[in-house]
């Protein structure tokens, strides 16, 4: 990917993320025209029409208010991910946004699909990838199985960000914290994982600078150490 990547802990399409999303839109080169934004509710594809429709509507309203031309695409399963009617819209996008839901489902739906390949062509030309929650998790090396509290059942993810796991909602208490603790104990010495608090984003590019934006913090964890970074801080991702 050549465009920016935004790993978002929560808050997609809400006013709390306006500053982050304005930054992402300003980073693209739209040649003086309104940037094209594609909103993908793929991670909610198993939740029914009401949920999918909500994400499509919220994405359209949010980015229209920020001055973009918005294309909410109902790519919700493998058939729609391979539908050629969406290819050109994805290829011409300046920003592609994956909202939250089921990380395993969105990865398995998009992997090797025409939609994913078209999105990659857009990113290679400078488009932004923004992923919230599940949309952020699929860029790490692996996605854990939350149903088993992180004990087995992991699947490979796209591995675009060199973190073993990208964990959104990091400041959220409860069973989620148990999963994080299990995964951390299983890291190898050379591995790290990223935790992204709610209403917070980590924005950057692989091999370049990554900066915290938003309300709270980003956390870099190894098996033996943990470091937290506030908004404006640079996170030293290898």
Residue spans of the language-model regions?
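Residue-level preference for short coil/turn positions at secondary-structure junctions
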Residues: 1, 33, 91-92, 125
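General beta-strand structural signal in soluble alpha/beta enzymes
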Residues: 7, 71-72, 97-98, 129-132, ...
């Amino acid at each position: 990917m050549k465009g920016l990547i935004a790993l978002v802990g929560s808050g997609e399409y809400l006013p709390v993320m306006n500053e982050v999303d304005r930054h992402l839109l300003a980073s693209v080169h739209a040649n003086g025209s309104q940037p094209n934004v594609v909103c993908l509710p793929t991670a909610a594809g198993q939740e029914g029409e009401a949920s999918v429709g909500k994400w499509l509507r919220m994405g359209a309203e949010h980015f229209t208010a920020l001055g973009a031309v918005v294309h909410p695409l109902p790519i919700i399963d493998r058939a729609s991910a391979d539908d050629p009617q969406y290819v050109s819209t994805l290829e011409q996008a300046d920003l592609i946004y994956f909202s939250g839901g089921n990380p395993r489902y969105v990865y398995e739906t998009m992997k090797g699909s025409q939609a994913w390949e078209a999105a990659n062509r857009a990113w290679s030309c400078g488009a932004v990838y923004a992923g919230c929650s599940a949309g952020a998790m699929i860029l790490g090396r692996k996605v854990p199985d939350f149903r088993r509290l992180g004990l087995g059942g992991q699947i490979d993810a796209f591995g675009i960000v060199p973190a073993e796991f990208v964990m959104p909602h990091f400041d959220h208490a409860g069973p989620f914290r148990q999963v994080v603790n299990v995964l951390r104990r299983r890291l190898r010495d050379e591995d790290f994982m990223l935790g992204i608090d709610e209403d917070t984003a980590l924005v950057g590019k692989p091999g370049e600078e990554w900066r915290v934006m938003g309300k709270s913090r980003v956390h870099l964890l190894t098996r033996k150490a943990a470091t937290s970074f506030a908004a404006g801080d640079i996170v030293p991702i290898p």
